[in-house]
Amino acid sequence: METPNIISHTNLLSKIDLEKQNPAPIFPTITELKSEARSLFSLAFPTILAALILYARSAISMLFLGHIGELELAGGSLAIAFANITGYSVLAGLALGMDPLCSQAFGAGRPKLLSLTLQRTVLFLLTSSVVIVALWLNLGKIMIYLHQDPSISSLAQTYILCSIPDLLTNSFLHPLRIYLRAQGITSPLTLATLAGTIFHIPMNFFLVSYLGWGFMGVSMAAAASNLLVVIFLVAHVWIAGLHQPTWTRPSSECFKDWGPVVTLAIPSCIGVCLEWWWYEIMTVLCGLLIDPSTPVASMGILIQTTSLLYIFPSSLGLAVSTRVGNELGSNRPNKARLSAIVAVSFAGVMGLTASAFAWGVSDVWGWIFTNDVAIIKLTAAALPILGLCELGNCPQTVGCGVVRGTARPSMAANINLGAFYLVGTPVAVGLTFWAAYGFCGLWVGLLAAQICCAAMMLYVVATTDWEKEAIRARKLTCTEGVDVVITTTQTNGDLSEPLIYVVTVATD
């Protein structure tokens, strides 16, 4: 039998008013800073390790593709780019919609909401995958319509068809990662990713070399590796009993009340895709330059470089999103604010470090990827600009994590739209083609976008009303339709918001 605990909205407001009368110190103590830094590190470090392992696995796939043949490498690269734009970025963005729901639910002590959000998100991603698969089935026709080489388009079609199982696997993998991270469980994620990558190497040799499946084997090996990650993750969590505090057996409830998940997932997806796609647009613009092969190759090297550097702020962004969500769900707005302050401070240090790295290796970095002198010179010219971009990219990425933890993905999406497409794109096109800055003009456009994005994101973080966000978190976790009754009381004719929240708590 479940009995309801009634939490008065008036009492909640009174508690927050009391906090305002006795506010936390403006400057946190050294002990508080150290404690929060440890909390962020415990979440971010395993995430960084997992991301670096995934980066290595991607490099292994490209290495096998390159050894098969130049045409196969081109077809596989085209398929991977199309899959990233239309599939993987979409699923990753949609899955982030569950991030604030899970982290705030965990902080609020709502275990059933955690597992239901996981189940609903998996179903939502599988449903979305049906639409994506329909698009992938027509990749060859789409590429020929866009005047791509028929031979490369045919190979790309074959490669992406072999990637469909991987798309479905990602519909489980992304939600599982967020579900566990919201509870502070990160070690299984790193171990599972490592196991999948170790398995990836012999699987490539077996499918590509032993069975002779060529570049189709590379795609199948990637799908098999991700499937192993999911199996390993589920098995580890289940055997260790890590699921027990929050798991609810799937029922008809997971087919209902999708509103909060979808409402947060769509703007999260838009925000991720707007930024992700901008880099693909830069590659397309390179193809319009004189002698495009050199700038396109250099752009590929630089995007790989910025992807490597992005691992660190993105992992910190995921960590602070979880921390902010947990603290808001627990009705501790001051601790959520502290987490944001510490994370953004770390992001500034990350930006300086990444910038120094880009400047320091500018003359030698290109040699790691190619012996072509023209490509190396172009890469060396753009790397210092890339370094300046990181000064904005690191803070804005972590700031986006803070905003995501407060369940405001629409805010982040609007900022990305304005910064990358209303500022960055005009600057890039204008400098590249009208002012004749060429290849470096594209990167100056990215610099303008990153500066604008960082400024707006940090302004949003700095002006956040944390007490208000704590109330929003209570509403989000208490009005989701799960074992909750909401009673509204009309006062002076005003029915603008609920005045009483009734949360049921299981009792023996």
Swiss-Prot record:
Tissue occurrence: Detected in the part of the veins in cotyledons of 6-day-old seedlings and the basal parts of the petioles in older plants. Highly expressed in the vascular tissues of hypocotyl in dark-grown seedlings.
GO CC annotations on file: late endosome; late endosome membrane
GO molecular function: antiporter activity; xenobiotic transmembrane transporter activity
Location in or out of the cell: Late endosome membrane
Remarks, miscellaneous: Overexpression of DTX52 alters shoot developmental programs leading to a loss of apical dominance phenotype.
Name of the protein: Protein DETOXIFICATION 52
CDD domains: MATE_eukaryotic (cd13132)
Family to which this protein belongs: Belongs to the multi antimicrobial extrusion (MATE) (TC 2.A.66.1) family.
Bilayer topology term: Multi-pass membrane protein
Principal cellular location given in the protein's record: membrane
Record-linked Pfam families: MatE
Keywords associated with the record: Endosome, Membrane, Transmembrane, Transmembrane helix, Transport
Transmembrane parts of this sequence: 48-68, 78-98, 122-142, 156-176, 189-209, 222-242, 270-290, 300-320, 341-361, 368-388, 415-437, 441-463
Gene Ontology BP terms: leaf senescence; root morphogenesis; xenobiotic detoxification by transmembrane export across the plasma membrane
Keyword NADP listed: no
Top-level taxon in the UniProt lineage: Eukaryota
Function field: May act as a negative regulator of hypocotyl cell elongation in the light.
